[in-house]
Amino acid sequence: LSRFLRVVNRVIHHIVLRPAWVLPLCSHKNLAMTLIASVSGIRGTIGGGVGSNLTPLDAVAFASAYGQWLRTQSGSDRRLRVALGRDARTSGEALSDLVVSTLRFQGIDVLDLGLSTTPTVEMMVPWEGCDGGIILTASHNPGDWNALKLLNAKGEFLSAEDGAKILKAREEGNFIFSPVSELGLRIAVNDGIERHIQAILNLDLVDADAIRARGFSIAVDAVASTGGIAIPMLLKALGVARIEGLHCEPTGHFPHNPEPLRKHLDEICALVPETKCDLGIVVDPDVDRLVFVSEDGELFGEEYTLVAVADYLLQHHPGHVVSNLSSSRALRDIAERHNSTYSASAVGEVHVVAEMKAKGAVLGGEGNGGIILPELHYGRDALVGVALFLTYLAQRGGTCSALRATYPNYAMAKEKMDLDPSIDTDALLARVAVAHQELNPSTVDGVKIDFPDRWVHLRKSNTEPIIRIYTEAPTQAEAEALATEFAAKLSSL
């Protein structure tokens, strides 16, 4: 034990001499490798060098910092508990062993959920009286990535202030480990997803009887991760008549790029009409993003997942809804249709949740297919999104494409502009805001300018010298033209 601790501390002091944000490296295969540490956790590519990739030693250092922060937060010597789950990435089991062992050496009990989903871990934290949680997933990043995503005692992502404390603890590296008589326990928990599904079935707005009566046939693309466990289990519990599984074995060998964008979804878009399914369901590796495919093989629209769920919920519970500044205007339109109100937050789940709490919102989310239902928990949850969407479709009748046709039709474009690292990005965005001050642009997160029938959102990256340009307009051509126009304006400024 003493030799292990000496090695860990030597490694930690080596790691913290390096910058704490983005550290690119070329491996022996000449592939760009990256480690990104931020207030929400640490993510990176597996392999390569310490401090430049997500290596075992980086994982130990970051887990140690999190464990020490939890101890400080508790303000006592009581036994701490952490819930931990992972997606199906091939590096996940080994990474889990490292993180669990590190926390145990800090005297922390770990409730190991094994293969799980991000929303399941989030819910298990308060259910099990845990002091925090860790999700091992790089979300929609490719399979050579992994990450430690950190939760507080509410099962929510950390605030910027708390995240900064963990980064500081990692930089200082003065970790204290427990004597052998006080090592934490590893406790296997095997029913997390079942409990999550039961909580969804208990919601008043989820009508399993209506879904069962409709006799749905549904195709599922789970990208060979844990959605292949959770989504079919949920559909069976809801009474879905037939499930066509596509990549539902959680091998972690992603069959296509795991980000649920149209260009990656040819297989399921073909499978749905070929097998005469009523719709298709696509989730990302950790099951917090949700995309539907209509019966004709066309995407329902990632931005419209939240719109459809809001349409259903606001008919029963009018109130306030929240999305981020880069999400479609369609959510605001639907809120107005139901005599409800809308506001936008900065990009990022933690900001959406903060705005929801401030406004007492009944629903929130992000345009990437993330649904946040505070009645269940404050986290993006594809499972509850599926249950609410199917309930609505079952109750109203008709097809997915017919439902989609009832919503305002907007098109989005996303671009990025590379900058010289010496450029003051904040000053550049400020000049854009001044140039359009008559339109009262939002500066909550970069600059967002609303025009009568379109908008543009410019925001700097926290990890790269670029500005991201998001636009929405009545047609795809107009959205792309607006993005090009503002890229040119940025260049001229």
Segments (PLM) and residue ranges:
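Phosphate-binding and adjacent anionic-ligand microenvironments
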Residues: L279, H317-L493
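N-terminal small/polar loop signature for handling phosphorylated ligands or for N-terminal nucleophile
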Residues: Q68-G75, R81-W145, M233-V293
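An N-terminal, well-structured beta->alpha segment
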Residues: S27-S101, F105-Q106, R186-I218
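Proline/glycine-rich low-complexity loops and linkers
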Residues: L113, K165-Q198, N202, S294-G367, ...
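Gly/Ser/Thr-enriched, mixed-charge loops and adjacent short helices
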Residues: T45, N146-T275
